[in-house]
From Swiss-Prot:
Modification after translation (UniProt): Not glycosylated.
Record keywords, A-Z: Cell membrane, Coiled coil, Malaria, Membrane, Repeat, Secreted, Signal
Function: During the asexual blood stage, involved in the sialic acid-independent (SAID) merozoite invasion of host erythrocytes by binding to host SLC4A1/Band 3 protein on the surface of the host erythrocyte.
Family: Belongs to the plasmodium ABRA family.
Species per Swiss-Prot/TrEMBL record: Plasmodium falciparum (isolate 3D7)
Assembly and oligomerization: Forms a complex composed of MSP1, MSP6, MSP7, MSP9 and MSP3; within the complex, MSP6 and MSP9 mediate the binding to the host erythrocyte. Interacts with MSP1 subunits p19 and p42; the interaction is direct. Interacts with host SLC4A1/Band 3 protein (via the 5ABC region). MSP1 subunits p19 or p42, and MSP9 form a co-ligand complex that interacts with host SLC4A1/Band 3 protein.
Name of this protein: Merozoite surface protein 9
Subcellular location: Cell membrane; Parasitophorous vacuole lumen; Secreted
Segments for region (Disordered): 202-282, 459-487, 512-540, 666-743
Membrane topology: Peripheral membrane protein
Any coiled-coil regions, as ranges: 644-733
Amino acid sequence: MMNMKIVLFSLLLFVIRWNIISCNKNDKNQGVDMNVLNNYENLFKFVKCEYCNEHTYVKGKKAPSDPQCADIKEECKELLKEKQYTDSVTYLMDGFKSANNSANNGKKNNAEEMKNLVNFLQSHKKLIKALKKNIESIQNKKHLIYKNKSYNPLLLSCVKKMNMLKENVDYIQKNQNLFKELMNQKATYSFVNTKKKIISLKSQGHKKETSQNQNENNDNQKYQEVNDEDDVNDEEDTNDDEDTNDEEDTNDDEDTNDDEDTNDEEDTNDEEDHENNNATAYELGIVPVNDVLNVNMKNMITGNNFMDVVKNTLAQSGGLGSNDLINFLNQGKEIGENLLNITKMNLGDKNNLESFPLDELNMLKDNLINYEFILDNLKTSVLNKLKDLLLRLLYKAYVSYKKRKAQEKGLPEPTVTNEEYVEELKKGILDMGIKLLFSKVKSLLKKLKNKIFPKKKEDNQAVDTKSMEEPKVKAQPALRGVEPTEDSNIMNSINNVMDEIDFFEKELIENNNTPNVVPPTQSKKKNKNETVSGMDENFDNHPENYFKEEYYYDENDDMEVKVKKIGVTLKKFEPLKNGNVSETIKLIHLGNKDKKHIEAINNDIQIIKQELQAIYNELMNYTNGNKNIQQIFQQNILENDVLNQETEEEMEKQVEAITKQIEAEVDALAPKNKEEEEKEKEKEEKEKEEKEKEKEEKEKEEKEKEEKEKEEKEEEKKEKEEEQEEEEEEEIVPENLTTEESK
């Protein structure tokens, strides 16, 4: 039930922000009764019916799939038939246009006047941007324009825009009192008759021009003016609702980032405006908006920081941005004089363009840049003033609600100080903060379970819920497709935490403190067709609970004593396989002592954080440090207690720094590698030279051997020849001797 309430509440915010319903001007003349806006129950009933309405008036809304819608449709059958419902939804999405406001001769409240002023400033700013772009294009094509000044369409359009800007500046100078009145008006809620002023503001951009293509230019300008107003309305609703609708809105914006089922698609036409707004740190009262959004979990639940903003805003009485307005008017005089010097010509005669001073465009462009900067500051001041007005309107709605409740109960009308009213408002923020905390934890656990245990395609089909609740039969872990026991323990632990949160959430909503409350183990068997209660039905059904009943218990009490005091059977968590989880989550019924309640609730939050920390540690061990799960878990559960996540830009910077370091290291290693390569080459060359020397020595030795062998052979031959000669001589001598003897 609480989940759907939060979704419905966020739907209301989106309905107010987007301004996406287009209706006829004749229908707008009726408006919506202010009683709807000042009555929380009726307003919530409208949102409920619109949430479950199949033929919804909200463009782009998904078809409802909530099981509670069946009962809601039965309640809203008669309401859907009435024309008042369609008109109310239409005007709720059109910026709180009231019936009294539109029926009383065009009277406007202060917030509407401030919105019209912002629309005018936004169109004025867009005209300056268009003129700057036109001047840049002229400067880039100056050599062509010098040749053809008389019939150059770019130069002609520039002169037209300068004349339009001159008329706007003259109008602002003549109506200084109007601007000062809007900026310095106090946040009263009486309607002021400013019909002529608003008409003059809205019609200033539609003045006719005495030139050719007159009708075409007027049509284009009207179309641009309408788009500008739509963009600014979207921008205003976005910024104002996000910053003024107390901590519920802040937490809902955080929930929209957590839940996958919320509408993540923004209007593409508003991207430029949002980028410009994000670049400026708007302030709400005295405290910056960033301080409200970046508070820790404890301050978010107690609402201390936001209450400081409320008190500071209620204490303010003067206007905002008077210095910015003076600077804006003074700079506008200089722009007007500059434009007057440049545009002293009749646009009907194109030959006058020959005298157009192109050299003075640089000075004009510089003045436009300064003027645009001052215009942004003035727009910021107007937005701050508008936020203060809306915050006071929120406070006044709460006061009127308390008075009406007192009249219905027959009690005297409350007459207390503003501080006491703020404390009452703080109780509502405290209650809503706890409910939103439960919703955020549960949605996060669902996402974690889907991340760790993704469903197969076959499992995505519709499955009976009873079959899902039946315990799985544990098979052998070796079988294919069976989850290990560790996975089952983790999933069961997550499911148990979600069941506990569901149960405590229902207790906070219903405030059932009887001893017959169904424990969490049997809560799944309860009747699901319960009607959705209004935001303050607990107050009506059980007023004594809010003022008298208090249920506290001590840590040292036995379990039976705790059950008697709270009326709820506490269920133990199923312990994890490798971790110890604390035994119980405690439920404290909200009584009338704020300090004790805040301390008890903060203790419960710390216990929930410890439980989630244990689950987180177990999941990290199982997933081996999965970074994606770690980021999601840290951002949505641990808030500021866990390490802050690095943004994408920081990651890119780190990656660039790492790549630069790697490149530097590579560059540093490069000369070392070259020296090693040169040394290796020298070694190889030396080895080659040594091998060649060895070869040469071997060849020399072989040659020497061959020569020695040849010499030995020759010597042997010589010796043989000498021996032969000696033998021949010996043979010759005896023959001679014989001859002599014969004689």
